Swiss-Prot record:
Documented EC number(s): 2.7.1.21
Protein name: Thymidine kinase
Binding positions for Zn(2+) per the UniProt entry: 152, 155, 184, 187
One Pfam family per UniProt: TK
Catalytic activity entry: thymidine + ATP = dTMP + ADP + H(+)
Class in the EC hierarchy, top level: transferase
Binding locations of ATP: 23-30, 95-98
GO molecular function terms noted in the UniProt entry: ATP binding; thymidine kinase activity; zinc ion binding
């Protein structure tokens, strides 16, 4: 039988690391983030969750997955604000990280260097397949990367990218299933070709 002392538990809690969960829309990124954070809470770890204040699709003060699972969060405008609320936490979760400024990379490093487990979820590419916001740099410094996949709505294979259905060219357009669809590489290229022909 193994017995863990309180000192051992504290030491284990204070090992900082950065975990990034990325993929297309509808791939389960937020679902996985919520799962990990709820497990940490169950283990009596001190948890704080952040999301960009601009993301009010389902709730202003909760992180909510497309499957309606949710967890209370703190909406913020700047990544620097994360440091103000995190010094006494064991685990920090950050959803929709692609919408934060590039300073998020330094913030995550500082938190991890100070013994905090940081779990970040976000889109790795925008609808044009361009790496999105601070996510590429976070992937580079992460201790662990989990790439999750949606299912292509056209053929049923693993989705590779998010295709925007609406006509807007704005890079940031908060939307749902009426605005975006996950597609595999082949179906994505076919959709682009069709859009070009219809112009």
């Amino acid at each position: 039988m193994v017995v863990f002392s309180e000192d051992h538990i504290q030491e284990t809690r204070r090992r900082g690391r950065i975990e990034v969960i990325c993929g297309s829309m509808f791939s389960g990124k937020t679902e996985e983030l919520i799962r990990r954070l709820k497990r940490a809470k169950f283990a009596r770890q001190r948890v704080e969750i952040f999301k960009p204040a601009i993301d009010t699709r389902y709730s202003e003060e909760e992180v909510v997955s497309h499957d309606s699972n949710s967890i209370a969060s703190t909406p913020i405008d700047s990544s620097a604000s994360i440091l103000l609320f995190s010094s006494d936490k064991d685990v920090v979760g950050i959803d929709e990280a692609q919408f934060f400024d590039e300073g998020l990379v330094d913030v995550c490093n500082k938190l991890a260097d100070n013994g905090i487990r940081v779990i970040v979820a976000g889109l790795d590419m925008d609808f044009r397949r361009v790496p999105f916001g601070p996510i590429p740099a976070l992937l580079a410094i992460a201790d662990e990367v989990t790439k999750v996949h949606a299912i292509c709505v056209k053929c049923g294979n693993l989705a590779y990218a998010t295709h925007r259905i609406t006509k807007s060219e704005k890079r940031v357009l908060l939307g749902e299933k009426a605005d975006y669809e996950p597609l595999c590489r082949t179906c994505y290229m076919e959709a682009l070709k069709e859009e070009t022909e219809n112009k």
